[in-house]
Swiss-Prot record:
Binds 3 Mg(2+) or Mn(2+) ions per subunit. Mg(2+) 3 binds at D491, T495, E499. It comes from Quercus ilex (Holly oak). The Asp-Asp-Xaa-Xaa-Asp/Glu (DDXXD/E) motif is important for the catalytic activity, presumably through binding to Mg(2+). Keywords: Chloroplast, Lyase, Magnesium, Manganese, Metal-binding, Plastid, Transit peptide. This is Myrcene synthase, chloroplastic. Its EC number is 4.2.3.15. (2E)-geranyl diphosphate binds at R310, D347, D351, R488, D491.
């Protein structure tokens, strides 16, 4: 049934729905001011939530945060200071020497792979580029891919594509028989099959060889797991079949792989010691960031005054570690957390609590970006808007100080777009309107909040800001679009059941079921297919010429990865679950025990 569904419907083009004041469903008073407020505005809230016995409001019954501010403040930050810095610098130099000494191309690639999976590659970007340049140029200078070594060929292909080099899928043709199928004897090479499987996820649209490689390797790796053979390799295979490396959150992957590597027969003790100490040092930087944003969140008063909304400061910060973990980007993580927290709160205003009349007023006030216009709002919306207004203006002020560039109009546009698209969904719900899947996705890739996050991301990590990038940013380039679609579809897979129970518009799964008569299981399979198809589009655009920096593009990819991670086992953001709690503990709270010998 699922296969018929996948082939019977055309692939959606995911064009952006136009926002026009002439569109009745998006009709909003268009009065804007690009005024800039450098100092925060204070708001005295008369009551905690404006209520009226005549207004029937929904409730999501969100539970309080399990991570309260006092607990975050009590965290003891270890692994800081001169001793740790001295130790890590010694280990870093030892590993740098390894990178310079290794000359065998396969050993070079394997060392890069280990460094990436241990979360250490960010220390050696120049060395890794030098090695990959050499591997790539030698290959084009007459050196051939080694047809007899599937593992080496696939590893080489994957690392080169990951780092932006152009490599043809045809390198895998030498592993096919005269009928054009992958050779049956390859099934005996499980290490090679796993390498082929991971490489296949870097495919773009139309690359049929890699499609075949994915299907072929998946089938035989699943058979290998069933036979329960060599334990360590089976663990790696199971892990990859759950999610390929290309789709995984890098920091969480590093934490998992450090444990695996510790028990590897070929473990390099220097690499292991470096990985464990570096993880703890980076975690200490994250804990310092977390304390700051927890203090900010408490100071907003949103938890007390908007009691219907999600109180998720740690989960919001967890998102940011998924986007950019390197210790030097602490400012980015702290600002990202504010953006995530504001999106979460405003989403609950539109989805859970606000009446349609109130939401139209709120959208109008955000469009104006004018504190004088907020008198028309109920009290709970006043504090919400003021927190948004002050926080975003402060971010813009930081950029003005740093780069002498006025960015408030770009940030404001991102929030206006978000609220407009929230309002569309609120009207759908109010009118009991059931959109088509196409119509839903055209709205929902904006309402997921990812474009708003990524617009802010550009300014947080870019210096200097360029006109070419800004012109592109205003139209939401494809790299933002594909990341946002994946985030939305992953969210829907994890949250749609709970959201429908509390009262919400149909999500992607229900839209597809309504259109086709498919079962929920069949619809879920189709949404997974759309995620996979969108990754192909993103793979193409990440390697294309772009006005954006590598770090920004990586953040866009990481947002998609983080969404798939957080919604893998249900609503890991709003409702929380055991998996999310365990991941937060391992990534942000509990350091890796070190061998003191």
């Amino acid at each position: 049934m699922a296969l018929k569904l996948l082939t019977s419907l055309p692939m959606y083009n995911f064009s952006r729905v136009p926002v026009s004041s002439k569109d009745p469903i998006l009709l909003v008073t268009s009065r804007t001011r690009n005024g800039y407020l450098a100092r925060p505005v204070q708001c005295m809230v008369a009551n905690k939530v404006s209520t009226s016995p005549d207004i029937l409001r929904r409730s999501a019954n969100y539970q309080p945060s399990i991570w309260n501010h006092d607990y975050i403040e009590s965290l003891r930050i270890e692994y800081v200071g001169e001793t740790c810095t001295r130790q890590i610098n010694v280990l870093k130099e030892q590993v740098r020497m390894m990178l310079h000494k290794v000359v065998n191309p396969l050993e070079q690639l394997e060392l890069i792979e280990i460094l990436q999976r241990l979360g250490l590659s960010y220390h050696f970007e120049e060395e890794i580029k030098r090695i990959l340049d050499g591997v790539y140029n030698n290959d084009h200078g007459g050196d051939t891919w080694k047809a007899e070594n599937l593992y080496a060929t696939a590893l080489k292909f994957r690392l080169l594509r990951q780092h932006g080099y152009s490599v043809s899928q045809e390198v895998f043709n030498s592993f096919k028989d005269e009928r054009g199928s992958f050779k049956a004897c390859l099934c005996e090479d499980t290490k090679g099959m796993l390498s082929l499987y991971e490489a296949s996820f870097f495919l773009i649209e139309g690359e049929n060889i890699l499609e075949e490689a994915r299907d072929f390797s998946t089938k035989h790796l699943e058979e290998y797991v069933k036979q329960n053979k060599e334990k360590n390799l089976a663990t790696l295979v199971n892990h990859s079949l759950e999610f390929p490396l290309h789709w995984r959150m890098p920091r969480l992957e590093a934490r998992w792989f450090i444990n695996i590597y510790r028990h590897n027969q070929d473990v390099n003790p220097i690499l292991l010691e470096f990985a464990e100490l570096d993880f703890n040092i980076v975690q200490a930087a994250h804990q310092a960031d977390l304390k700051q944003v927890s203090t900010w969140w408490k100071s907003t008063g949103l938890v007390e005054n908007l009691s219907f909304a999600r109180d998720r400061p740690v989960e919001n910060f967890f998102w940011t570690v998924g986007l950019i973990f390197q210790p030097q980007f602490g400012y980015c993580r702290r600002m990202f957390t504010k953006v995530f927290a504001l999106i979460t709160t405003i989403d609950d205003v539109y989805d859970v609590y606000g009446t349609l009349d109130e939401l139209e007023l709120f959208t109008d006030v955000v469009e104006r970006w004018d504190i004088n216009a907020m008198d028309q709002l109920p009290d709970y919306m006043k504090i919400c808007f003021l927190t948004l207004h002050n926080s975003v203006n402060e971010m813009a002020l930081d950029t003005m100080k740093e780069q002498r560039f006025h960015i408030i109009k770009y940030l404001k546009k991102a929030w206006v777009d978000l609220c407009r698209y929230y309002l569309v969904e609120a009207k759908w719900y109010s009118n009991k309107y059931r959109p088509s899947l196409q119509e839903y996705i055209e709205n929902a890739w904006i309402s997921i909040g990812a474009p708003t996050i990524l617009v802010h991301a550009y300014f947080f990590v870019t210096n200097p800001i360029t006109k070419e990038a800004l012109d592109c940013l205003e139209e939401y380039p494809n790299i933002i679009r594909w990341s946002s679609i994946i985030a939305r579809l992953a969210d829907d897979l994890g949250t749609s059941t709970d959201e429908l129970k509390r009262g919400d518009v149909p999500k992607a799964i229900q839209c597809y079921m309504n259109e086709t008569g498919a079962s929920e299981e069949g619809a879920r399979e189709y949404i997974k297919y759309l995620i996979s198809a969108t990754w192909k589009k993103m793979n193409k655009d990440r390697a294309a010429s772009s006005p954006f920096s590598h770090i920004f593009i990586e953040i866009a990819l990481n947002l998609a990865r983080m969404a798939q991670c957080l919604y893998q086992h249900g609503d890991g953001h709003g409702l929380g679950n055991r998996e999310t709690k365990d991941r937060i503990l391992s990534l942000l709270i509990q350091p890796i025990p070190l061998n003191k010998d």
